[in-house]
Amino acid sequence: MTTDHRWTTPITADLLRGAVDLETTTRGLLPHRLTARARRQIPDDQLAMAEAQPSGVRLVFRTRATTIELDTLPTKRVYQGFPPPADGVYDLLIDGRLAAQASVSGGNVRTVTDMFTQTSVLAEGPAGTARFADLPAGEKDVEIWLPHTEITELIALRTDAPVEQSPPSRRRTWLHHGSSISHGSNAGHPSAIWPALAAAAGGVELVNLGFGGSALLDPFTARAMRDIPADLISVKIGINIVNSDAMRLRAFTPAVHGFLDTIREGHPSTPLLVVSAILCPVQEDTPGPLAPDLDGGRLRFTATGDPAERSAGRLTLTIIRDELAKIVQQRAADDPNLHYLDGRDLYGESDYAEFPLPDAVHPDGAGHRRIAENFARLAFGDGGPFATKTR
């Protein structure tokens, strides 16, 4: 891109979708997926890192440009003793279809030194540029989906033709909360995480509050969801409660009620779908906590709890699914817009046989596609809780 034919467009909230809050930094803007108030109440580095990773966040604009450059400062996560992951992927969509991809090398590196405590150290690095060249000529709608597993500070947007703000979307907004699977763990690129694929199939705008390791019924997350505008809401509950061994059944049931009560304060009649965990054999009937298993040179997870303690209130996915079904049935008596979906209908025994979980917990790219297909059919399809109402 020559300097004689270059436009630099300020990156503002008008160009971003999927972000809950934007933090002004010395370089530019840092998208967040929790409000500033909620972030002040985060108790650990795991969620602080996860909510700042822009899963589902994208720049959206119209342009005739054939070359687009986005300067960013990524913060990448690596685990001590393991090879660093590949650089995060930026997906560029034209008129809703994936047209190009890029990555940014360098950046900050946060090294997790203890997988149990998530203790980490940060090494600072340089900013870089995601460059998309040889794009089709002519006016087009462009989306740049940011890497879902890299904190991404936005610095500058350059093009070889002017950029116009896209008109406000007329599509419904879907607000979703879940665990690392909803965050996009093990998906190959950001527009291929299951919530993004399901949103595309359902024709809705996604706000993704999938937080790796952190779907723990935190009240500050419920308050954030209460205050975020949405036409459709889903909450996926179970796997993090079990794999962190965060609570017992006595605490779990009122925590779910409280979480749903808080959401309903801001969205009293919005379709609200409670989704339980997908099939995860290591946690179906064995309590947590989950522990990393490094035997064989690759990361897998194993449950370390004692199944005999289920009678004392230790939680498993089977117990949580049963309890969630009861909670929703009870509440639906006076909340007709509350619905329940068993996560095994998204990914169950037959899906596991076809697309096993590589690390025993997280689906791969094919698994994400299967979950998205089933969610789109069951939630957005005819008769589903998110189906478009016809008059």
Where is each model-derived feature located?
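A general structural detector for well-ordered alpha-helical segments in enzyme core domains, enriched
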Residues: 194, 252-259, 320-327
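Acidic/histidine-rich helix-loop elements
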Residues: 208-215, 243, 360-363
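Oxyanion-hole/transition-state-stabilizing segment in secreted/luminal serine hydrolases
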Residues: 198, 217-265, 269, 277-287, ...
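Loop/turn elements at helix/coil->beta-strand transitions in domains of secreted/extracellular proteins
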Residues: 203-205, 229-232, 267-272, 335-338
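Catalytic His-Asp segment of secreted/periplasmic serine-dependent ester chemistry enzymes
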Residues: 281-391
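N-terminal secretory targeting modules
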Residues: 1-173, 294, 380-391
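Serine-esterase "nucleophile elbow" of acetyl-processing enzymes
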Residues: 135, 142-229
